[in-house]
Amino acid sequence: MNFTVIIPARYASSRLPRKPLLDIAGKPMIQHVWEKAQQAGATRVIIATDHPEIEATAKAFGAEVCMTSDQHNSGTERLAEVIEKMQIADNEIIVNVQGDEPLIPPVIVSQVAENLDRCQVNMATLAVKLTTKEELFNPNAVKALADKNGMALYFSRAPIPFARDHFADCDDAFVASQNYLRHIGIYAYRAGFVKQYVAWQPTQLEQLESLEQLRALWYGEKIHIELAKQAPQVGVDTQEDLERVRRILA
């Protein structure tokens, strides 16, 4: 099966300046992500960046690079620009892998592409089971709710579904016994759909939750959710995250 991985790599970061270029075990962070995408069996891996320093660094380790605008409001807008510039066919499967996830398991990159290939939808993603009360009530852990066919009903930062009769005694054991899902921020799209997605006006719902995928649901698209074969470790958002990843990859 053919699929293309696009890795958005934005230069500006309020918490970690030059984040994609930060050294981890002798390599820039973006190279670790690129290597994981290669290991996933992608037909093509493209780094999409808005800065010449990232472009030069990526080309030096052999990556294909597409320069994009620095005015995009989301990673999906950057994907759409790459699809247009590279003239990627509408039926091509695109996997969006974040440029700050050097520990992403290659198996889930290929899994989300295969998931989309099997389903008659334009967008697919992955989730893992929630097992702790702390995660359930953590707004940074996005919850996903799917129907019997694995189609997304909703994504939220709130605990969904809400256990009305167990709110007072909700503990880790109860959470683990239910089918609560934590969304993993990896997506596969059909390339033509990405262009449609960015043509839609942003919705109040996605802005309220700060969850971009809600735009697709609002406009009536289906998103297929599959349980990930391997739970990924967290990406790099803070200096503490960076130091932890450096220790793991040392």
Curated annotation (Swiss-Prot):
It comes from Actinobacillus pleuropneumoniae serotype 3 (strain JL03). It is found in: Cytoplasm. Activates KDO (a required 8-carbon sugar) for incorporation into bacterial lipopolysaccharide in Gram-negative bacteria. Pathway: Nucleotide-sugar biosynthesis; CMP-3-deoxy-D-manno-octulosonate biosynthesis; CMP-3-deoxy-D-manno-octulosonate from 3-deoxy-D-manno-octulosonate and CTP: step 1/1; Bacterial outer membrane biogenesis; lipopolysaccharide biosynthesis. Its EC number is 2.7.7.38. Pfam families: CTP_transf_3. GO terms for biological process: CMP-keto-3-deoxy-D-manno-octulosonic acid biosynthetic process; lipopolysaccharide biosynthetic process. This is 3-deoxy-manno-octulosonate cytidylyltransferase.
